């Protein structure tokens, strides 16, 4: 192709002088890109008006713009689409060329960026620690990483996890060295969520969510478990209790079986359960080791005469499919005039069952370890049990929960003091218990227990 010195079309072109840098396109370290039309890398041009990358063949289709630069070509040579010829234009070339120091710095920054990305590939995020490939990275890039807030946060998390792992190992030693022979396990709704039973207080899935409040026109969200409101209108409770009632569809979780394993090993003093779903019973935790502090669906009674009714009788009412039939179970005794039957669960406004008060003081005196699992520690008096074992008694306390709870300066958890005996495993409580059993070398026993129960 011939090269003409002048082109009449240049004066009418809208060259993007601010963004286009011809020196960058001529840099031998830059890989030739593909044509956006045909993906070819032959005779590649860059439009100096819009920046689009196109081959010589397809640039004819790019008829709106005229002037193009050839990749890795003579930096004085341009291609005019309208003239269909190569042209020489020094003035425009100079305007489209940036300071070499600036472009070299940009290229260096890009190079560093890719090295940082390379380091992230080498960075073992799963184990939260640098692996041996870190040594192969340039020292200059290591400095970039060390000054990065992101990596600083990762390293901080790594250090915190390492500290927690070391503390948990201390807790493991206490159990393995027979320092914990009378363990109290305090459990809440969180241990049954994996069974499909909603956590009362969960905003999205809990029974206290706004949808249920609106649906049943409740005066306040906790009214469904308020004893005075139940006496006034038991319908909302029984409608919502379909999600809670033991109907055979809910299975025990690893946490339930872990507590059973503690009992089998003779280490469980008591399980204080805040759940009424009876899964502790189903898991096989002995009744003499179990305090259902908030009652249980296992037994129901007439609110008038106290006659006891079976779970089957209650289920027939709750799960009936007749839209004309109430879900509220009623007493069959004629003299009771269809009095409401209430399960033996503790409503707001009711006292805890006698078995709680009969055992709590003696259990506190005998307890040598407290494990708290899956609870918000918001409901009294159960929430105060943590305070019964203050730091100065050196009784180990382990919190297994999806978030830190129960921290305060009045006998609550204090995880920031490495000298005390407070431990935590924050995350999914089922996974945490499986990890705990593995650290104790109980994982095989726990899995065997889970499998044997599930096959029965």
Curated annotation (Swiss-Prot):
Q: Which InterPro entries match?
A: DHS-like_NAD/FAD-binding_dom, NAD-dep_sirtuin_deacylases, Sirtuin, Sirtuin_cat_small_dom_sf, Ssirtuin_cat_dom, Znf_RING/FYVE/PHD
* Co-factor note (free text): Binds 1 zinc ion per subunit.
One GO location term (cellular component): nucleus
UniProt keywords, alphabetically: Metal-binding, NAD, Transferase, Zinc
Q: What class of enzyme is it?
A: transferase
Q: GO terms for biological process?
A: rDNA heterochromatin formation
Domain of life assignment: Eukaryota
Which parts of the sequence belong to the Deacetylase sirtuin-type domain? 161-443
Cofactors demanded by this protein: Zn(2+)
Annotated Pfam families:
SIR2 (PF02146)
User: What name is this protein filed under?
Assistant: NAD-dependent deacetylase sir2C
Could you tell me which species this protein originates from? Dictyostelium discoideum (Social amoeba)
């Amino acid at each position: 192709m011939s090269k003409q010195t002048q082109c009449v079309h240049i004066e009418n072109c809208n060259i993007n002088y601010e963004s286009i840098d011809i020196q960058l396109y001529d840099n031998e370290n830059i890989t030739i890109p593909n044509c956006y039309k045909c993906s070819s890398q032959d005779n590649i041009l860059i439009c100096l008006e819009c920046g689009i990358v196109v081959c010589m063949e397809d640039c004819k289709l790019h008829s709106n713009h005229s002037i193009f630069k050839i990749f890795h070509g003579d930096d004085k040579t341009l291609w005019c689409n309208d003239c269909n010829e190569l042209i020489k234009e020094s003035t425009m070339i100079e305007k489209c060329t940036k300071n070499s120091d600036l472009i070299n710095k940009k290229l260096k920054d890009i190079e560093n960026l890719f090295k940082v990305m390379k380091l992230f590939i080498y960075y073992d995020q799963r184990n939260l620690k640098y692996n041996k490939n870190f040594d192969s990275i340039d020292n200059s890039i290591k400095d970039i990483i060390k000054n990065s807030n992101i990596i600083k946060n990762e390293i901080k998390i790594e250090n915190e996890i390492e500290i927690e792992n070391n503390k948990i190992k201390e807790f493991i030693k206490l159990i393995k060295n027979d320092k914990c022979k009378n363990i109290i396990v305090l459990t809440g709704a969180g241990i049954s969520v994996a069974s499909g039973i909603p956590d009362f207080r969960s905003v999205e899935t809990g029974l206290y969510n706004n949808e249920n409040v609106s649906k049943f026109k409740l005066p306040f969200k906790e009214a469904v478990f308020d004893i005075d409101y139940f006496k006034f209108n038991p319908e909302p409770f029984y409608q919502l209790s379909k999600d809670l009632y033991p109907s055979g569809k809910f299975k025990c979780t690893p946490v339930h079986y872990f507590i059973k394993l503690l009992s089998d090993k003779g280490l469980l003093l008591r399980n204080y359960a805040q759940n009424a779903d009876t899964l502790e019973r189903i898991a096989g935790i002995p009744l003499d080791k179990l305090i259902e502090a908030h009652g249980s669906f296992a037994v129901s009674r007439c609110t008038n005469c106290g006659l006891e009714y079976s779970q089957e009788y209650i289920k027939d009412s709750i799960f009936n499919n007749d839209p004309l039939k109430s879900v509220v179970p009623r007493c069959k005794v004629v003299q009771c005039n269809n009095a409401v039957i209430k399960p033996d669960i503790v409503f707001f406004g009711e006292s805890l069952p006698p078995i709680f008060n009969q055992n709590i003081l003696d259990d506190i005196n005998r307890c040598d370890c407290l494990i708290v699992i899956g609870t918000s520690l918001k409901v009294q008096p159960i929430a105060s049990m943590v305070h019964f074992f203050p730091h100065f008694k050196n009784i180990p306390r382990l919190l297994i929960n999806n978030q830190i709870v129960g921290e305060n300066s009045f006998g609550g958890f204090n995880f920031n003091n490495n000298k005390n005996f407070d431990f935590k495993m924050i995350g999914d409580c089922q996974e945490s218990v499986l990890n705990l059993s593995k650290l104790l070398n109980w994982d095989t026993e726990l899995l065997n227990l889970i499998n044997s129960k599930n096959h029965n």
